[in-house]
Amino acid sequence: CDRRQRQMCIRDRYTLDAFRKILPVLPKDCIISDIASVKTGLKKFYEESGFRYVSSHPMFGPTFASLSNLSSENAIIISEGDHLGKIFFKDLYQTLRLNIFEYTFDEHDETVAYSLSIPFVSTFVFAAVMKHQEAPGTTFKKHMAIAKGLLSEDDYLLQEILFNPRTPGQVTNIRTELKNLLEIIENKDAEGMKKYLTKIREKIKSVSYTHLRAHETRR
């Protein structure tokens, strides 16, 4: 405020409580902001606060990202935020060489449901059914490393990401694919397996993040 910055480092679950405690002592010309992964309730809070605001989400963390080279990592800036606030975070994220995208709150929640809940649920299932291996293969070890990293995250953060209203639809898609794959395996359907592998290989080839450039922040 008054060209000074005040920062608080808190867990996502305390974001709204922290804002409610400090707003009474902030000048009305302040821009309040968050970089929370979980934005449940933030849009309504901001709109009723009487303050200008900016909200963003760096889509990476210290568990898996290489913090010395973030050029392959992404950050989302919420489009409903204050213009000057968005410029501040755009400049900051450009300095870190992040790929910057501008989404609405709803688009952010949809992205989180897709890009976080699918790998989270898949990893949880792996961890739930795995057992000790004396001589694990490379793929198993890589999955284990991912599971250990993910499960080291805060319980509340994992819960809130999975409790996103859009997550059940993604989990239903996983369940459908598992059902289809199980039928192929149980029936020893070689032709079905060949078609399935062809389908998912083509899907991986077709997955491109360039389509997100339509939302990319102008630089």
Positions of PLM-derived features:
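Histidine-centered active-site/metal-ligand motif
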Residues: 5, 57, 108, 117-120, ...
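Rossmann-like NAD(P)-binding element
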Residues: 4-7, 11-22
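Rossmann-fold dinucleotide-binding core
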Residues: 38-99, 109
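Short, basic, helix/turn surface patches
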Residues: 17-21, 81-88, 126-137
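ADP-ribose/adenylate-binding Rossmann-like module
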Residues: 26-41
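Short, conserved loop/helix-junction motifs that constitute active-site signature segments
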Residues: 24-27, 69-70
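Single conserved hydrophobic/aromatic residue that forms the stacking wall/gate
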Residues: 1-6, 10, 209-219
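An accessory alpha-helical subdomain
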Residues: 102-208
